[in-house]
Structure formats: C-alpha cells, structure tokens
C-alpha cells in the first residue's frame, strides 16, 4: 500500500528535465551579440500518462539560436515541435531530423536582424507593458481576438526592471530598439518552469516580431501599441 512506501520509494510525477546542445560552429552576430545555433529538448513527466505502458512518449524539441551574452533562447515556429510523440528511439531520431530539415535559419536570422532597425520611445515601451498587464485581465472572448501573450505579471514586472537595470539591454532614459526589447522578454522568460519555457520562448518571438511589424503599420499586433 502507498501508505507504507518510504519517500525514496515514491515516484515524483512532477519531475521535469531539459537539455541544451550548442553548435558553436553555426553562429551569427546581431547588435554585437553572438548567437549560436542551439538544440533544446524538454521531458516533463507531469504531462504524461505514467500508468499506460503502451502510450507514446512525449517530448518537446526545438532548434533555434541562443544569445551567448545572456543565454536567452530565440525560438521560431518552424524550429519547434511542442507535441512530439514517439514509441522508439528511431522514431525520435526521425522526428528530430524532420524538425531540423524544416528549420530555416537564414530566414530567422534575417528577422532577428530587422529588430535592430526599429526603435520606440519610453512612452511606447510603457504603453506596451501596460497592455501586456491588461491582457491578463481581459475576458476570454476579448482575448480570442488578440494574438496570445503568455508571459505572467511577474515576468512583465521583470521586463520593466530589466529595462532600467539590465547590464546588456537596459535603455532607461533613451529610445529602446526592438532587439533589446526582445531580449528583455526572453530574459524574463528564463524564470518559467521547464515545461512552459519553450512555449513562452516561441511566444516572445512572435510578440517581438509582431509588435515590430505593428510599429510599421501592420494591424495584427496593433492592440499592444494603441
């Protein structure tokens, strides 16, 4: 019976594990920051049915770029598989190769470079943070008409603090470029649990690129800057 199990005998269902493999021979420099190609994987028991012997094993796998200045991860849609279910190591190998082959690093680096070409003033920055805080309180029907924003209130507060104090990306008292803004978002995401880290990494990329486009007149993320 479970009541007679020692602590060392008990299975901990909320255990999470992650790995990160850098490929330093594939790199790019953006705004003075070196980015290495990186492969990241997550395994979370709390998202699996541990009682079933025949159910596929669940993994999350991503390939993207890691900012070597701060270890922030840049994840893109074509480089992320959030629900990779396999029944063998061969299946995992094939799924990983398929993900890697579909990833377009040149396109993603071009998008990251473009962030450095756009700046916003302090008022615009505060407006965006205010909208991000407001997003959390919106009714579900309203949120459905706005692009997703997955950062928590605590993480948004971290973005505000880093804007003032971060040694690499602070811009207090001056205009902030979108590359720095993006890294404030990805930096705040490092406080996420392992099993939500990659989802939020992708979301911060979409947010930064979407808000960048909105500053140039695009409508989709316009709500965050209005």
Which role does the model predict for each range below?
Residues 5-226:
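Intrinsically disordered, low-complexity regions enriched in serine/threonine
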